[in-house]
Amino acid sequence: MPVISEEAYAIQYAARKMTEETAGGRAEVHAQVGINVAPCLQNCVFCSFAARNAIFRHSKAMPPEEVIERCLAFEGQGANAIYLMATANFPFEEFLRFGRQVREALQPDTVLIANIGDFDDEGAIALRKAGFNGIYHAIRLGEGAVTGIKPERRLQTVRAARRAGLLVGTCVEPVGPEHTLDELVEKTLLTREMRPVFSGAARRIAIPGTDLAGLGMVSEARMALILAVVRLAVGRGVSFNCTHEPNDIGAMAGANLFWAENGANPRDPEEKTENNRGYTVAKCREILREAGWELVTGPSRAFQTGCSG
């Protein structure tokens, strides 16, 4: 379907109205701290951490005090949820220690989310006990072909998280010009079957020098149509619809969840994404507000549960 067409605009309008109705016209900004950089042997071709891409040749983790400071800053700036992100090969027990320390420092009702590699039931329970409310996890486009992870392994992690009482957010990503309609439909239906607290669609960011960079990027206009279709397909049982990176067109088309980022970022060759691709909480809020959304204040409404720990 042409991006500039009456039909495309009708789809985006319908998606916007659905999100407005399910979320009460409200939007959220979540904030992620990437706690480490490392050459990752899972070798997701689209990722700046992939060992094959030779962007980060060293392993380095932030000191816990810096992670806590960054999380508290995000909390103070009005982020509705705080995410800790680590590479897939980051030691799980060390990640749990980070999580416990951050959980203790944050307000009791602040939502804490893990964005990490795969884990089993024992790991899911440990995350819950450490104070995490949920996880971000996606079965990415090209999973098993352009990544070193089998799709079933990703699904096993989602199931383990749900059994442990962790809520799951996900997304159809990373969308590139090479992806077919059939691939997008497959991942959209899979997203719906995951029964997430939020869904959406995000484009692949072309990282210079990587194998996929030559394929280019999907335009924000095309992504607005894709995220609108995902929104409608997932249905009214999911109130929040995300896109990344934050942009005005997506917000108009029904995206009501953006991320601010600092620290490491798998779409960024810079070690500190706040100096390059990362958005601030204030900028995300500004884009959403300009698109006519009312901002949620306080803890995330998408992740409506407490945590043990």
Regions found by a protein language model. Give the residues of each.
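N-terminal [4Fe-4S]-dependent radical SAM core
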Residues: 2-58
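Short secondary-structure transition/capping segments
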Residues: 66, 94-97, 146-150, 181-184, ...
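Core AdoMet radical
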Residues: 35, 51-66, 70, 74-99, ...
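Conserved, mostly hydrophobic/aromatic
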Residues: 15, 44, 161, 191, ...
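Alpha-helix-loop-beta-strand connector modules within alpha/beta enzyme cores
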Residues: 92-116, 149-170, 214-237, 281-296
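Conserved strand-turn element in the central/C-terminal portion of the radical SAM core barrel
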Residues: 89-91, 144-145, 157-183, 201-216, ...
